[in-house]
Amino acid sequence: MNDYRPLTTEEIEQLQQNGCWAEDWTSVNVAEDFNPEHMRQVMLYGEVCIGSFDKSIEVSPGFHKHSGIRNATLHNVIIGDDCLIENIGGFINNYTIGDECYLSNVSTIETTEGATYGEANVISVLNEAGDGNIISFSELSSQLAALMLKHSHNKEFRETLFQLVREYVSSRLPERGLIGNNVKIANTKEIINCIINDYCEVNGAERLSDCTLLGDATSSVYIGTGVIAENTIIDHGASITNGANLQDCFVGEACQINNSFTASASVFFANSVMSNGEACAAFCGPFSASHHKSSLIIGSQVSFYNAGSATNFSNHAYKMGPIHWGILERGTKTASGSYLFLPAHIGAYSVCLGKTMAHPDTTSFPFSYIIGEGEKTILIPGRNLVTVGLYRDINKWPKRDLRPAEHRKSIINQEWLSPFVISKATEGRRILQELCTTCGNQCQEYHYQGLTIPRSSLLSGIRFYDMLISLYLGQVIKKATLPAAAEEEGQEYTPLSEQAIHNGEEAWTDLGGLLLPQALESQLVEGIIDGTTEDIESVINALSEAHSHYADFNQAYAFSLIRQLYEEATPAAFSLIETRADEAKSLWTEAIRKDAQKEYDLGDVDEDTFLHFANSISPAT
């Protein structure tokens, strides 16, 4: 911003000749090289500072207009250099505007008393009728929000963490609204109590109230026609367009929300895409997608998720209100017309079909089909492992991360073969084996915690989980530096630390895309409660630090599993693991080809498409 000086008598006279008026000309200050020729029909109230008008502004591709202020009313405003402000139907009140901005055909831009800009807004996610469990602020990430959500029942933790966020926000909250450099705002009705960062664009919006738009030259925010957003923070690279309506939301990096999608008290992170439908009290982690008008995501936590058309959840059980919620672990899909009666907890990379009423908990059965069929909930364990859909998903997500390297607050570990999933599959295999042993081999159906498992599905489920474990262990052995291999290649072998081994061998968790040992999460929670973690930056750094050691923790878990299955982690065991992994890869890729062949045989896919996919399947995936 400039150093501003008072207007000269000559400048005041020229401004008056141009149809300008000031409540008090002595309260108007300008840049040293200010040119009054470029101000016409401007009403000035309160303290106003105006920059220079040397450049032209590109208002549309190839169409430039000289900077200046025309047909506007300003009150307590600071304006940087080379801005074009024209046709302000109402007024601009209590705002600071940066350099080279274009503001045209806007009704009102104003900061009022008590403005929060969407910062430190507490919302209730999952339990629609519950106390607020996520506090929104500009540095919110998927894993930090997941941590808040997971431990919201711990009052001491919640209050302490919320206070750390409030301290962070209060130290940075401006006294009035800010519009950064190179911002475009056009054809928009109301912007009230908003911070709009550099290079953001708002075109045709209905109303933005108490919002923060985060952006810079590498990754800006775009707000389009008909959008209404209230008490919402919109992160770098996101776009909200075509009549979307947001209230009490956080929209993360590179998210797209459009086509009249409506959301309240919901958070969306990293590359999520929401169109046409509705979300309420929803946690949508990285790569969540819903494209259909008839789909409702309510009271649910999802990530790497795809909602089929007419997907619906119910968070009312009877008459106690919308207090129930569910978790669909990473990679889950809901098929067209599916209905899930909450509470429910669905295992990773599963597919829900039909109307599921039995409140299933399938966390120990990843990669499954969960089928609602009348009063029954049928479980087909592990079936999704050998489908075209899974293969396409695990290969497409890495290619669809649209965030620039500078703006990746949400940590996304895209490993589909991870301790988090493998530990669940190992437990699932044990349960299936016990059911087979306990109930005998002659049963046509097995029953487990309200789930019905057909005999053939139980037996194939055991095989699928054996395949999965072999794939995982083979992958880890391939990547790990083993003592014998290091010696043979003349490399220095650095063993895992005792701490890495201890943490990696224990239970694992998924915090909104961050895979880490449960022990590290517990340590972080304890540190927040006892005050050893003193500020929100330390919390964020601790999560990043946990991610940086994933490879060591992963290897520690894998070696622990090897000792369980092979007694010792010896060269002979490693050789056997590699052999079994190669066999599993061949079986897995062949099963996926057969799954694709089914669709081709039905005549639903042309030959070229089928052959292109079949030839693209890599056994090394």
Indicate where each model-derived feature is located.
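Glycine-rich hexapeptide-repeat left-handed beta-helix
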Residues: 6, 10, 14-22, 30-53, ...
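Conserved short histidine dyad/triad with adjacent acidic residue
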Residues: 25
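Phosphate-/polyanion-interacting regions in eukaryotic proteins
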Residues: 68-70, 74-80, 84-159, 186, ...
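A charged, amphipathic alpha-helical module
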Residues: 165-179, 185
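Core alpha-helical transmembrane segments of integral membrane proteins
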Residues: 179, 183-202, 210-221, 226
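Long, compositionally biased intrinsically disordered regions
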Residues: 373-621
